[in-house]
């Protein structure tokens, strides 16, 4: 018996409703197969990878001011409603009454990895003059689902156009999927008074797809897909590093208020593991160190923040180090002493100058000349560095969120400060040293 390793054509017979046919199958002409209910990425790959959750929140116990920034005007409010484990957003009957909710962090994105942003939301029946929006956007770039008071729409916006912000808005009559008006393949009519799961799948590269889905009773109903490839002369939005955002506004002064938008859980899931890869940056104190005048008092060693020109940058602190020496008199040798440390978000820093990192590509500024930390701020990490272990580095938990965010709806960077204190009450004038390392995703 001989064996021929080269592929050979084969003929396959099949019948359909009494008829028969012969198909010759080769490597060049394979047998066609079709898979039902299988999703693929924008590159045509089957979605078989393990997804990674980049962001989620649940509002079990409050409005989560450490994660979400809120701006209200003309009597609008945002409040925690324990009966729905969510946030009620409310505007008054006055024109211009508005509430905006936006994550302090922009969302991480890795090119080549489609991502899905999910909202649990409850709208209300559309009311002329009342506008609701939610999606991944910052007012200048991104995408969102909109109820403008008269119609629903899927929208992308781009600030990189020569004539200002470019808007592509597709109303319900223009959707290329199931319009969920009772006349689509599902026969479903989406209720604005019911809690809904609305998902937006996107891929950037400047020319990716943006898909809008409703998830109802375990089934995905695609309502519209925006195709940007081979069509636009510019990226569909300037950056994929954008915040999750919801808006509610009384645009015309509808007098029958208040009007509501109810925000539930959110999640952002990426296909495959993105890992926290990026460009490393590091800053340290001067080699002469920094004097700690009084024992058991915290002093700032180093602080970092986003550049005012890079507020959508993704900065992930990873590692810091501290050490201290004390010399009781010029005739004595310096000794290593024990320290307490704290890593503080938005300390009330006194004095100092913010300086751009030497790398012109960096997203960050540093400050090593501040003199006090005040009493404000949130301690993200704390601990002790004992004598002989002085200089030991502290690696931050990779699964904990330390990303530097923004407030003022994206206009003011958070700060991250490494502060230390001498533990020994008999030590004054010790000299401390420190360094911080972080990753910038570009």
Residue spans for each PLM region:
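C-terminal interaction-tip segments
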Residues: 127-150, 217-222, 283, 421-442
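Extended, low-complexity segments enriched in Ser/Thr/Gly and acidic residues that occur primarily
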Residues: 1-71, 77, 271-332, 420-421
């Amino acid at each position: 018996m001989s064996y021929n390793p080269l592929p050979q054509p084969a003929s396959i017979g099949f019948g359909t409703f009494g008829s028969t046919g012969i198909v010759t199958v080769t490597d060049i002409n394979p047998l066609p197969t079709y898979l039902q209910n299988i999703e693929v990425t924008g590159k045509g790959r089957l979605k078989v990878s393990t997804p990674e959750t980049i962001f989620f929140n649940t509002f079990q116990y409050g409005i989560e001011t450490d994660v979400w920034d809120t701006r209200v005007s003309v009597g609008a409010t945002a409040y925690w409603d324990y009966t729905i484990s969510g946030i009620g957003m409310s505007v008054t009957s006055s024109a211009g009454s508005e509430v905006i909710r936006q994550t302090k962090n922009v969302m991480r994105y890795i090119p080549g990895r489609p991502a899905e942003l999910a909202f649990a939301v409850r709208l209300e029946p559309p009311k002329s003059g009342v506008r609701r929006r939610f999606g991944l956007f910052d007012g200048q770039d991104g995408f969102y689902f909109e109820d403008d008071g008269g119609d629903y729409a899927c929208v992308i916006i781009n600030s990189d156009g020569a004539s200002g912000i470019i808007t592509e808005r597709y109303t319900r009559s223009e959707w290329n999927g199931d319009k969920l008006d009772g006349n689509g393949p599902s026969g479903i009519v989406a209720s604005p008074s019911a809690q809904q799961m609305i998902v937006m799948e996107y891929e950037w590269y400047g020319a990716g797809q943006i898909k809008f889905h409703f998830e109802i009773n375990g089934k995905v109903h695609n309502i519209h897909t925006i195709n940007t490839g081979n069509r636009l002369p510019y990226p569909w939005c300037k950056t994929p590093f954008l915040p999750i955002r919801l808006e509610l506004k009384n645009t015309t002064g509808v007098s029958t208020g208040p009007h509501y938008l109810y925000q539930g859980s959110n999640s952002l899931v990426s296909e495959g593991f993105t890992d926290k890869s990026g460009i490393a940056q590091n800053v340290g104190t001067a080699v002469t160190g920094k004097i700690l005048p009084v024992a058991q008092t915290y002093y700032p060693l180093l602080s970092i923040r986003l550049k005012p020109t890079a507020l959508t940058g993704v900065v992930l602190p990873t590692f810091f180090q501290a050490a201290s020496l004390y010399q009781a008199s010029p005739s004595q040798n310096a000794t290593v002493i024990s320290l307490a440390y704290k890593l503080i978000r938005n300390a009330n820093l006194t004095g100092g100058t913010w300086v751009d990192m030497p790398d012109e590509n960096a997203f960050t500024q540093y400050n090593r000349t501040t003199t006090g930390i005040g009493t404000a701020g949130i301690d993200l990490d704390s601990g002790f560095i004992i004598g002989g272990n002085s200089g030991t580095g502290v690696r931050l938990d990779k699964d904990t969120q330390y990303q530097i965010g923004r407030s003022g709806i994206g206009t003011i960077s958070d700060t991250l400060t490494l502060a230390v204190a001498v533990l020994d009450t008999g030590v004054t004038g010790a000299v401390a040293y420190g360094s911080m390392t972080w990753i910038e995703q570009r």
